[in-house]
Amino acid sequence: VKSFERPQTGERAVLVRLGLGTPVDTEDLQEFRQLATSAGAIPVATVTGRRDRPDPRYFMGSGKAEELRDVAVANEAEVVLVDHALSPSQERNLEKLTGRRVLDRSGLILDIFAQRARSFEGKLQVELAQLKHISTRLVRGWTHLERQSGGIGMRGPGETQLETDRRLIGQRVKILTKRLEKITQQRETGRQARAEIPVPSLALVGYTNAGKSTLFRSWTGADAYVADQLFATLDPTVRRITLPGGTLVVGADTVGFIRELPHELVAAFQSTLTEAREATLLLHVIDASDARRDEHIAQVDAVLAEIGAENIPQILVYNKIDRLAVQPRIDRNADGQATAVWISAEKRLGLDLLAAAVAERLTRFARKARIRIQPSGGAVRSRLYEAKAVRAEHPGEDGSSELDVELPDVELMTLARTPGVQILDVPGTPLPESLAFQASPPVKSAAGDF
C-alpha cells in the first residue's frame, strides 16, 4: 500500500504545540522534539501558541495557521508535526493551507513504530494500526494502490477511487487481523507449554527511554537493542534469569509507554503486551534523573490498567542514578517488603541489589494455601516438592491431589494460571484480587483444615 497523493514528505520539520487553557509546557515540547528526531526529522522551527479550546477548522486559529504556513515556507520545511490529536478534516485543512504534509502526534508515533518493528509480528501489528488510523483520513485517492478488484457485474467503472481505497484497506485489515490471530494462538500455545512447569516471570515495563533494554542486557547478557532514543525497543525479548539462591525466572523486555499513546497501538500490541499482563512480577523501570518521573509513573500505570495488568505486583526500579548524587539502595515499606531499588544499568550499579530484591519478593511473605492438581500436573507437583513448599498432601479418588502449600502471592499467581491447577482456599487472610478469579469456595474434605 503506497502513500497518499500529498506533498512529498521530507526531513525538515516545523513542530507545533499549543497550550490549551494553560501556557505551553516546555517539557512536553522537548519530548515531542525527541519524538520528531527519533522519526528521522530535523526540527528547523517551532510554532507555539495558546487557546482555550481547539478550533474546528485548523485546531489552531486562522491567524496562527497562516503564521505556521509562513514559518514552513521561510524555513523550507517539508513536513509539519503537530503535538496534538487532529481530526481528519483539521489535518487536511492544514495540508491545503501550508502545502506540506501534516502529521499529528498519533501519526508520528505510528511512523516511529513502523521504523522500529523488526519481527514479523511487530510489522503486522504496526501496519494494522496504521491502516486503521489512515482509514479515517481517506478523502481522495491513494491512486497507486493495487489495481481495482471486484467480480464481473459487481464493481464496474462506476466505483470511485475513494470506494476502491476503502475496500482495499478493509480487505488488508481483515488479512492482517487473521494473521495476527494465528500468531497470538501460537504465542498462547507456547505460553501454556511453559506453564506446564510454572516458572515465575518478570516483565520490564516503563516510560520510553527509561533504560529498560539497557537493564535487560546488563542483567541477562541478551542481545537487546539499545539506543538513546524513544521507542528503540518494540519486539519483546525473553530470556532466562537465575536469581540469588538459584531461583530461575523468565524475564521479558517490552515496548515503552508514553503520554497519549495512540489507542490504535495499544489495541494492536495487545498480544505483545500479554508478556506484561501475565507476568508474575513487573519491574517498573523509571528514569530517576527525569524531573517528571512521577508523571511518567502515573502514565505507565494508566496503560497497565488499560491492558489489564494493574494488579500485577511491582518493584519500582529507579535507573540512571549515575546522573544523580544517589547511591544504590533498596526502599522498603512498613512491612519490610522491597518496593523500590535505585540502580544504574549502564554503569552496572546496584544490579546485585535488584536481583536480591526480586528474589526476596518471589520467596518472602509466603502464605498458606490449598491447591488441587489434576493427574496431568505431575510436573507441577514435583516442582512444589523440590521447592519444599508442600506441607501436606491429600490424594483424591479421581487421581487428583490436594496439596497444602506455603508460597508467596506471586508464585500463587503463577499457579493460578497453570493448566490443571486450581486454588481452593487461602485461609486466614483476604484472598488477593489477582487470585480471586481462580479460587473456589473452601472444600470440605476428610483431610481437615490446615
Language-model segments: which ranges?
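Switch I (effector-binding) loop of TRAFAC-class P-loop GTPase G-domains
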Residues: 1, 187, 193-200, 218-250, ...
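C-terminal-of-GTPase-core extension/linker across diverse P-loop GTPases
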Residues: 1-19, 28, 33, 132, ...
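N-terminal accessory targeting/assembly segments
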Residues: 1-105, 109-110, 423-424, 429-450
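Flexible beta-alpha connector loops of hexameric P-loop NTPases
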Residues: 19-24, 53-58, 116-121, 161, ...
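Conserved C-terminal guanine-recognition region of P-loop GTPase G domains, centered on the G4
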Residues: 27-38, 42, 65-74, 79, ...
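Short, acidic/turn-prone active-site loops that include or flank metal/cofactor-
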Residues: 106-110, 230-231, 346-347
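Short alpha-helix plus adjacent loop in nuclease-associated cores
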Residues: 107-128
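Short, charged, surface-exposed secondary-structure boundary motifs
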Residues: 111-116, 235, 351-353, 433-435
